[in-house]
C-alpha cells in the first residue's frame, strides 16, 4: 500500500515537471509557521553561511594544521608553527579559498542560466567535494587543491544566492530578505571562529608543541563540517523545494507554475502585474543584450570611463583596508601584538560576534542616510582607528597598554566597516551603471575585489611577522586615499534612477536613455500573461510592455539581485 502511494506521488511529480501543472502547494507543510518566501530564503542562505564559514575556518585551525603536518621541525624533531615553510604553506592554503573565489564568481553568471535552483544544487555539490577533500587531506598539495575547490564554490555562492533571493521574494520585502545573505555570511564567519575555541590556547609560533589526538581530528572536523550543511541544502532543494524561481519558470514557458508560486510568495490570488513585470523584464534583457557594450569598449568611452574606474577603485581599496585579513588571519594578527595566547581566539570570536550584531542593526541605515554619507562616515571611523593603532605601535609595541589600545582600535574599525564600506559598496556599484554596461562593469569591479583580497591576504603572514605596524600602516594609507577619492568624486545616488544620476546628467550615452528604451518598448505588442485568467485580465486592462515597464520603474526584476551584498 505504502509502495503504491509512493509510486503515485512519484508519477505526479514527474507529470508536474514535464507539463505546466502547478503542485497543490509550494511551501513545506513541516514548517507552516513560515511563509513560502521565508522558507525559500532560509534554504538559499545556507549557501551564504557556507561562504562565511569557509572564509574563516582556517583562521583558528591553521596553526594546528602546520603542527600536525610537521611543516616546521627543530633539530630534535619537535613541531612548531613559525618557520619559513610553515609561513609559505599556511599563507597559500589560507589564500586558496579567495583565489578559487575569483574563478567561481566568473563562472556563477553562466551557471545560473541552467536554473537558479540547479545552480545552487551544483554549487553545494562542489562545496561538499571540497570540504570532504579538505578533511581527508594528507599533505600540502591535497589540502591546497581542496581549498581551491571550496573557493570556487564560495565564488559561485556570491552570484547564485543573491539572484535566487531576488527572484523568490516579494518586491516590497526584497531589500529586507536580501540582507539575510549578508547576515548569514557574518554568522558563518562567527561560527567558523567559534568552533576554534575547542582547540584551546593557540600555540606560540616558536614554541615546540605536541598536537593532541583531539586537535588532530578537530581541524579535519572543522574543514569537513560544511559538507553536512551542503548535503542538507541539496536534500531540501531536491526533495522539499523541487522547483525553480518564477522568473526561470516563465523563461521555460511554465506560466501556470510561475503564477501559482507567485500567489504563495505574495499571499494573494491576483499576481497579473507581477507576471507581466517578469515578461517585460525578459524583453528588456533581450534588447539590452543585443545593445550591450563590452566593458573594454565602455572604458575607452569618455562617458563611462570615469564611473567604471571609480567603481573599480572603490572595490579594490575595500580590501586594502585590511578587512579580510581580520576575517581570515586575525589569530596571527593578535599574536603579532604579543598578546597572551589564551586570549587570541577569544578576541577573534568577539570580533566576529560584533560583526554579526552590527550587520543586524545597520540594515535600515542605507536608505535613510544615503550612500555617500555612510561611505564617508565609515572611512573616517576606520582611518581614525587604524591611524591611532599605527602611531601607538610605532611608539612602543611591547607596551601592554598599547597592545590593548590596538585591540580596541580593531574593534572600532569593524564598527566603521559594518555601517558603511562593507554593505554600501555592493549597493553602490550596482546603482551607478546604466543597463548597457551594468553586467560587464559590475562583474569587473567584483572580480577585482577578489583579486585585491588575494593580494592583501597572501602576504599578510609575512607582513605580520615584520610587526603589526607595517600592516596597519598600509591600511591607514589606503583609507586616507579612499576617503579623499570618496569626498571628491563619489556622488549621492539615494532615491535616484539612472536617468537622474549625477554621473550621466547632461552626458551623451552610447545607447540613449531609459526614456528611449521605453519608446522602443512602446512599439511592442502587449504580451499575454498566462493561459486563462491571466491573459484575459491582460486583454481587459490593455496592459502592454510599456505599462509594466513603468510600473517596474524601467528596471528588470533581476536588477536588485546583488543589492545589499558584502564580500566579507
Curated annotation (Swiss-Prot):
Side Extracellular, residues: 54-86, 141-142, 204-220, 328-345, 396-406, 465-469
Main location: membrane
Residue numbers binding alpha-D-glucose: 182, 318-319, 324, 426
InterPro entries, A to Z: GLUT, MFS_dom, MFS_sugar_transport-like, MFS_trans_sf, Sugar/inositol_transpt, Sugar_transporter_CS
Tree of life domain: Eukaryota
Localization terms from the record: Cell membrane
Summary of temperature dependence: Active from 32 to 42 degrees Celsius with D-glucose as substrate. Optimum temperature is above 37 degrees Celsius with D-fructose as substrate. Loses activity at 24 degrees Celsius with D-fructose as substrate.
Assembly and binders: Homodimer.
Similarity comment: Belongs to the major facilitator superfamily. Sugar transporter (TC 2.A.1.1) family.
Protein name per its UniProtKB record: Hexose transporter 1
Gene designation per UniProt: GT1
Amino acid at each position: 500500500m505504502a509502495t503504491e502511494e509512493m509510486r503515485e506521488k512519484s508519477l505526479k511529480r514527474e507529470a508536474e515537471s514535464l507539463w505546466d501543472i502547478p503542485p497543490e502547494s509550494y511551501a513545506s507543510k513541516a514548517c507552516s509557521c513560515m511563509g513560502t518566501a521565508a522558507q525559500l530564503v532560509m534554504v538559499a542562505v545556507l549557501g551564504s553561511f557556507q561562504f562565511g564559514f569557509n572564509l574563516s575556518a582556517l583562521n583558528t585551525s591553521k596553526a594546528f594544521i602546520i603542527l600536525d603536518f610537521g611543516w616546521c621541525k627543530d633539530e630534535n624533531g619537535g613541531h612548531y608553527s613559525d618557520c619559513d615553510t610553515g609561513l609559505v604553506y599556511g599563507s597559500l592554503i589560507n589564500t586558496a579559498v579567495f583565489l578559487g573565489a575569483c574563478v567561481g564568481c566568473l563562472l556563477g553568471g553562466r551557471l545560473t542560466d541552467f536554473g537558479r535552483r540547479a545552480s545552487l544544487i551544483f554549487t553545494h555539490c562542489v562545496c561538499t567535494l571540497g570540504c570532504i577533500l579538505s578533511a581527508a587531506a594528507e599533505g600540502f598539495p591535497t589540502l591546497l587543491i581542496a581549498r581551491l575547490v571550496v573557493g570556487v564554490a564560495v565564488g559561485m555562492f556570491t552570484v547564485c544566492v543573491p539572484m535566487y533571493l531576488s527572484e523568490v521574494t516579494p518586491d516590497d520585502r526584497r531589500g529586507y530578505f536580501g540582507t539575510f545573505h549578508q547576515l548569514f555570511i557574518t554568522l558563518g564567519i562567527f561560527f567558523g571562529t567559534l568552533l576554534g575555541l575547542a582547540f584551546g590556547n593557540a600555540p606560540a609560533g616558536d614554541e615546540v608543541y605536541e598536537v593532541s589526538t583531539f586537535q588532530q581530528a578537530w581541524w579535519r572536523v572543522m574543514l569537513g563540517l560544511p559538507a553536512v550543511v551542503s548535503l542538507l541544502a541539496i536534500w531540501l532543494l531536491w526533495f522539499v523545494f523541487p522547483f525553480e524561481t518564477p522568473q526561470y519558470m516563465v523563461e521555460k514557458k511554465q506560466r501556470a507554475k510561475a503564477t501559482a508560486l507567485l500567489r504563495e510568495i505574495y499571499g494573494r490570488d491576483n499576481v497579473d502585474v507581477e507576471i507581466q513585470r517578469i515578461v517585460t523584464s525578459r524583453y528588456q534583457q533581450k534588447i539590452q543584450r543585443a545593445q550591450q557594450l563590452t566593458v573594454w569598449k565602455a572604458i575607452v568611452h569618455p562617458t563611462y570611463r570615469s564611473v567604471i574606474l571609480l567603481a573599480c577603485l572603490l572595490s579594490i581599496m575595500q580590501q586594502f583596508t585590511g578587512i579580510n585579513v581580520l576575517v581570515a588571519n586575525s589569530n596571527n594578527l593578535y599574536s603579532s601584538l604579543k598578546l597572551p595566547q589564551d586570549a587570541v581566539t577569544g578576541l577573534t570570536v568577539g570580533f566576529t560576534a560584533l560583526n554579526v550584531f552590527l550587520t543586524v542593526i545597520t540594515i535600515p541605515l542605507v536608505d535613510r542616510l544615503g550612500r555617500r554619507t555612510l561611505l564617508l562616515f565609515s572611512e573616517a571611523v576606520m582611518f581614525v582607528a587604524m591611524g591611532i593603532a599605527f602611531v601607538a605601535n610605532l611608539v612602543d609595541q611591547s607596551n601592554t597598554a598599547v597592545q590593548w589600545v590596538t585591540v580596541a582600535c580593531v574593534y572600532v574599525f569593524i564598527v566603521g566597516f559594518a555601517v558603511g564600506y562593507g554593505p554600501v559598496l555592493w549597493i553602490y556599484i550596482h546603482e551607478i551603471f546604466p543597463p548597457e554596461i551594468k553586467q560587464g562593469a559590475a562583474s569587473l569591479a567584483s572580480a577585482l575585489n577578489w583579486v585585491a583580497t588575494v593580494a592583501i591576504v597572501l602576504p599578510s603572514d609575512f607582513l605580520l611577522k615584520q610587526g603589526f605596524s607595517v600592516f596597519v600602516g598600509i591600511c591607514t594609507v589606503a583609507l586616507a586615499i579612499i576617503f579623499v577619492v570618496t569626498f571628491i568624486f563619489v556622488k549621492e545616488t539615494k532615491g535616484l534612477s539612472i536617468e537622474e544620476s549625477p554621473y550621466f546628467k547632461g552626458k551623451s550615452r552610447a545607447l540613449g536613455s531609459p526614456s528611449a528604451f521605453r519608446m522602443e518598448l512602446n512599439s511592442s505588442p502587449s504580451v499575454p500573461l498566462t493561459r486563462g485568467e491571466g491573459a484575459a485580465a491582460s486583454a481587459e486592462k490593455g496592459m502592454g510592455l510599456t505599462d509594466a515597464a513603468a510600473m517596474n520603474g524601467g528596471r528588470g526584476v533581476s536588477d536588485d539581485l546583488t543589492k545589499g551584498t558584502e564580500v566579507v
